[in-house]
């Protein structure tokens, strides 16, 4: 009886030892572990390839600032456009920085060399009603360098004015020197002008315009056009009676 028990116990232990091991208990370096590692690596590699293909098909959107800088840098202007002196105007200036006004606000002076596109300019614009002692302007005016994005051309059409200009891999801005009335008031009753006899005349100040050549966009090409800019403040008088 005891021999039979020993035989059954030994057979039971042999059966347990010979049973197949689970994948969780497989030691490292065994064939089963290698198969699992190869399978997971292959799946990971396929996932990386899929994500790369997705990124190539759907690139990340660019920021608005990057798009604006890129569009400004892509507008390349042929340097030959600046070789003709008849296109130059003292009221139009291309510069990498805002042009300075003089300290007394009575003249405008900008000086630079030819290598930086800014031609030598020495222009004076009146900005104060007092020219000399005893001389006064009928209307007060103010002048300043401005940047324009749109303007009216000589044909009366609205055109796009170039702001940033790429020349020789350097970006310049197009500035316009404008003069306008300081306090325009078309109502002659509310405001009188210097030296105008209000008993005989109605008067008011108004800003006048003239045409200058500026670089504008025509499709994808840069071209010179005549555009309107403010250039002076004048006094308009109207006779009240026709007695004379």
UniProtKB/Swiss-Prot annotation:
Region of interest (Disordered), residue spans: 47-69
GO biological process, one term: nerve growth factor signaling pathway
MF annotations from Gene Ontology: growth factor activity; lipid binding; metalloendopeptidase inhibitor activity; nerve growth factor receptor binding; toxin activity
GO cellular component: axon; dendrite; extracellular space; synaptic vesicle
Signal sequence segment: 1-18
Disulfide pairings: 139-205, 181-233
Subcellular location field: Secreted
Tissue-level expression: Expressed by the venom gland.
Family annotation (Gene3D superfamilies): Cystine-knot cytokines (2.10.90.10)
Subunit structure and binding partners: Homodimer; non-covalently linked.
Designated name of the protein: Venom nerve growth factor 2
Higher taxonomy: Eukaryota, Metazoa, Chordata, Craniata, Vertebrata
